[in-house]
Amino acid sequence: MKIQFLFVLLSSYLCFGQNKTEKAIMLYSIDQYIKPVYNLSTDAALELASRISKAAYTKNKNVSIVLLDASRTTVLRMRGNGVGPHNTEASRRKAYTALSTKTPTLLLLRNSEKNPDTKNQNSLPELLLLSGGTPIWYKGEIIGSVGVSGGGSPENDDWIAQSASIPEIGITTTK
């Protein structure tokens, strides 16, 4: 008898517990929450590295190259023969700086020297205000960045980094 009484008592909770009395919250369309992002692929990184190496070769230089995708993930990292190991980390930080600021690092360096309010940007831990970093663009969107070190001069590093383009398909270092 006690079991039947408990069953009757609890069955009402089970039946009425399933009623939904809350109103549904109106959500925005999916486009308000999720955006597609172009990203640098491994194949593109390999092609860019080949073009960068050829540009460095025309200046008789071996360089370290780091390519990051739009989410700051390292897609490719390579060090030319005879290039010091510190150059590879410098290349990564140049690429990070270019990606983070969406500005070539040589331009960023020169602009920060002119403006006392931005001169302390070099004190931020990951930013490296040395030439040789540049963002990589596709259809007006940043898809990654490149950092180049070991070119022998700031102008060489910048010029070599600017060669990270595949204009045939719209990948360039200019917006």
Annotate the PLM regions.
Residues 19-175:
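Flexible, solvent-exposed loop/hinge segments and secondary-structure transition points
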Residues 1-20:
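Bacterial Sec-dependent N-terminal signal peptides
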